[in-house]
């Protein structure tokens, strides 16, 4: 069984691993400095942002922007004058709203842009971990680290600007709350960043391309600033070192050429020439193989991005390019339904549509996930689903019309903290799937990403949802306590066996979340040891998932992501590639179309191997072992976990915890990649959806993040009134005959005729009284099934669980 991400983090299973973690290097600060300069948000010399009074604000007021109106050409802005007692570098902090959710508030704001002394505006494009780790201030405001500025002595002008909207609970808007900001003098200048690759990249480049290291100071030096640097590869071997000097003048950067390096992931440590190693700034870069990953439908690899929340607007294009260069063919993303449809039928999707267009422009196929419904669409009894499933149909049709490659009908409905039931969710899935299917050239329909096999999924499948889908989906994570070498969870095998039992083994299975939990402290990236474990696990999980029959794997997650003491991203908090990024690039390029052939036989004890066809006339064996062993590989070309080719041919290879790729040419034609699975066209009877509704007082128990134990059914009295909604998602009126099929000891009496005419795109409601006889055992789940026919054809049933409370 695979653990799910929400339950594992809720359980706090990661605390035992924290003591072993190291810290990233910190930068020294001067001990003597002038007093901090604090400016109230409402003290702007020019602004078009409203000022709001609030006694909690430090000056009794603050700037408060919350507008759906597009800004004027100068943006929503506030300009301030600041008197600096001396020239130099100043750290900038602000009490304001963060652009992402934090542990202490769900309030978010637009990404800020800054301009100093009428210079160009620059977005504060920090990653989610920086914002997430901010300390609380008051209300929805946090104490934000906005980086460093170089001020001149005397008067300076500082302008904050908003030009991009953000997603709020009630819709998309331009938002900012600014109470005050503070500038603190830094002593001297220091090295602030080291990166590689060309401009507009996330420190990546292709093997064979010329590349430089770029070193950046946080200000202009008064004297020549001499720095030293060292570059080590994934295996800890030093591959480059040297010195560079930034001369006084207009420049704050210097470049140093890199030698011709093999594909891999590299760690750079740089510091002032006379500083200690503990003061070094650390950067990462990736040299990618010249062999590109497979594109189009043949690509089996995806990554979770959630770009609106995790990727600053100015980084979006470079991020998308980095994911494609890593070999991902798909991205999994989604927008908040409440923001996309703030009122019935009024859609506001342009913000998210721009993200999707950017991803597609870089060759990535979007998998769009439907979020919980807006508040206006829900009732206390329907939460988190719309009470009227026609809203689900129309919203899904709208999403499909924006041309994602696939639409996933929800995310982990089995492990939320509501009382929603699997039968209600199945009715929602049918309605949403019909909305997708009824669009021209529809995208693939993907079943909800189930967190864990169990009662919820079993009941949802009993409601015959598979016939509405092109793809079966699930998630799986290893035990969070396994920090050293996590084992791939059994979720893939469980789901394969479940699909086979249902006769649905021909439906492609996608693992739309797979990843691992790595415990971190605030302000700290993964340690080098953790980075290696993450890289190894990514390869093993992708390989074992494909070997278990998965058609596609989505890693969680691509962007930098820190959540409740756990780090998930393939990029560092500086948006630079970690070793797992390079491991993914090697995997996707070498496996190609990744046609699974079978396990590798004849290996020594402790060694594991799986064979794939690349689609290029090659056999690719992926091998690893708990302890180093020698394995014969006559006539093969060997690549390491980073994609580096072995220097010379050898009859044997040492296999260890780091996977290796053994590639040999094969005779015959490459295996053809199958066309995407498409379900048959849905019949008029399948366009009829039955949905059981019960009063809130009869709600099922709360799912408690999936930890609730049976009985899980609606809690009924001896006599309970309930309703059955009959939806007709066709374009003509339909006459439907309904029948109730209660379990033994129960009866269901219709209060209305059970033959009903349902208008096109309409709903009719039938009332029933459900009665339990004296022999019914309390607190035990029983099935209650409603069936129907349309012109003699069976309508997919609605099957619930009920219990006598």
Annotate each predicted stretch with a short phrase:
Residues 1-16:
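N-terminal secretory signal peptides and thylakoid transit peptides that target proteins
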Residues 29-191, 210, 290, 745-751:
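Extracytoplasmic
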Residues 516, 522-584, 600-602:
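Aromatic/acidic polysaccharide-binding cleft in carbohydrate-active enzymes
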Residues 432-457, 503-517, 550-561:
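Aromatic-lined carbohydrate-recognition surfaces of secreted/lumenal glycan-active proteins
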Residues 95, 601-636, 641-642, 664:
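Carbohydrate-binding surface patches
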Residues 649-687:
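C-terminal beta-strand-rich structural cap/linker in extracellular carbohydrate-active enzymes
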Residues 377-471, 475-494, 521-539, 569-571:
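Active-site cleft segment of glycoside hydrolase catalytic domains centered on the general acid/base Glu
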Residues 290-394, 408, 414:
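N-terminal substrate-binding region of glycoside hydrolase catalytic domains
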């Amino acid at each position: 069984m695979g653990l799910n991400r929400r339950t594992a983090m809720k359980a706090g299973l990661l605390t035992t691993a924290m003591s072993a973690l190291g810290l990233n290097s910190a930068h020294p600060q001067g001990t003597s400095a002038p007093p901090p300069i604090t400016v109230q948000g409402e003290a702007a010399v020019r602004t078009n942002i409203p000022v709001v009074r609030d006694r909690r604000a430090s000056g009794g007021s603050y700037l408060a922007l919350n507008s759906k109106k597009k800004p004027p050409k100068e943006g929503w802005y506030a300009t301030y004058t600041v008197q600096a007692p001396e020239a130099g570098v100043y750290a900038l902090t602000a009490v304001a709203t963060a652009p992402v959710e934090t542990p202490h508030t769900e309030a978010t704001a637009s990404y800020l842009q800054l301009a100093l002394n009428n210079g160009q505006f620059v977005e504060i494009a920090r990653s989610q971990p920086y914002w997430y780790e901010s300390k609380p201030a008051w209300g929805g405001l946090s104490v934000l680290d906005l980086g460093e500025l170089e001020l001149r002595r005397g008067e300076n002008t500082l302008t904050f600007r908003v030009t991009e909207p953000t997603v709020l609970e009630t819709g998309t808007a331009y938002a900012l709350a600014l109470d005050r900001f503070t500038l603190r003098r830094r002593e001297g200048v220091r090295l602030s960043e080291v990166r590689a690759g060309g401009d507009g990249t996330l420190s990546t480049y292709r093997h064979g391309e010329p590349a430089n290291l770029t070193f950046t100071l946080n200000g202009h030096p008064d004297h020549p600033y001499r720095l030293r640097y060292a570059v080590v590869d994934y295996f800890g071997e030093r591959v480059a070192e040297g010195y560079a000097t930034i001369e006084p003048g207009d420049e704050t950067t210097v470049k140093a050429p890199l030698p011709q390096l093999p594909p891999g992931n590299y760690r750079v440590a740089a510091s002032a020439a006379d500083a200690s190693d503990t003061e070094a700034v650390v950067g990462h870069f990736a040299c990618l193989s010249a062999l590109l990953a497979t594109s189009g439908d043949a690509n089996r690899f995806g990554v979770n991005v959630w770009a609106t929340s995790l990727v600053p607007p100015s980084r979006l294009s470079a991020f998308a390019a980095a994911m494609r260069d890593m070999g991902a063919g798909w991205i999994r993303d989604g927008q908040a339904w409440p923001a996309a449809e703030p009122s019935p039928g009024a859609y506001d999707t342009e913000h998210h549509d721009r993200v999707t267009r950017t991803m597609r422009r870089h060759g990535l196929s979007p998998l769009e996930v439907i979020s919980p419904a807006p508040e206006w669409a829900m009732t206390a009894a329907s939460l988190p689903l719309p009470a009227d499933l026609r809203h689900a149909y129309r919203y899904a049709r709208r999403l499909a019309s924006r041309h994602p490659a696939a639409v996933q009908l929800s995310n982990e409905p089995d492990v939320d903290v509501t009382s929603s039931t699997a039968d209600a969710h199945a009715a929602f899935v049918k309605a949403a799937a019909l909305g997708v299917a009824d669009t021209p050239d529809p995208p693939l329909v993907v079943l909800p990403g189930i967190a864990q096999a169990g009662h919820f999924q079993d009941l949802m499948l009993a409601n015959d949802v598979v016939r509405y889908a092109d793809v079966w989906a699930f998630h799986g994570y290893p035990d969070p306590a396994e920090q050293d070498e996590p084992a791939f969870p059994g979720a893939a095998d469980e789901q394969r066996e479940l699909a086979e039992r249902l006769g649905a083994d021909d439906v492609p299975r996608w693992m739309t979340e797979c990843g691992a939990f790595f415990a971190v402290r605030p302000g700290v990236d993964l340690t080098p040891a953790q980075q290696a474990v993450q890289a190894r696990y990514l390869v093993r999980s992708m390989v074992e998932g494909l070997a278990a029959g998965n058609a596609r794997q989505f890693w969680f997650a691509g962007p930098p992501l820190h959540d409740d003491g756990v780090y998930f991203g393939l990029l560092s908090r500086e948006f630079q590639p970690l070793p797992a990024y390079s491991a993914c690039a090697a995997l996707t390029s070498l496996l190609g179309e990744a046609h699974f052939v079978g396990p590798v036989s004849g290996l020594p004890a402790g060694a594991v191997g799986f064979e794939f066809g690349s689609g290029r006339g090659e056999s690719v064996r992926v091998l690893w072992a708990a302890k180093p062993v020698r394995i014969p590989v006559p006539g093969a070309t060997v690549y390491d976990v980073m994609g580096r080719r072995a220097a010379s041919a050898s009859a044997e290879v040492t296999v260890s915890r780091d996977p290796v790729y053994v590639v040999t040419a094969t005779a015959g034609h490459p295996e053809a990649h199958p066309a995407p699975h498409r379900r048959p066209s849905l019949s008029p009877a399948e366009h009829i959806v039955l949905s059981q509704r019960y009063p809130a007082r009869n709600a099922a128990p709360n799912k408690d993040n999936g930890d609730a134990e049976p009985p899980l059914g609606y809690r009924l009295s001896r006599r309970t009134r309930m309703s059955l909604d009959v939806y007709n998602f066709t374009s003509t009126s339909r006459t439907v005959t309904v029948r109730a099929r209660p379990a033994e000891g129960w009866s269901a009496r219709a209060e209305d005729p059970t033959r009903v005419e349902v208008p096109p795109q309409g709903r009719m409601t039938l009332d029933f009284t459900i009665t339990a006889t004296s022999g019914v055992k309390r607190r035990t789940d029983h099935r209650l099934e409603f069936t129907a026919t349309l012109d003699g054809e069976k309508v997919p049933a609605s099957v619930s669980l009920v219990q006598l409370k």
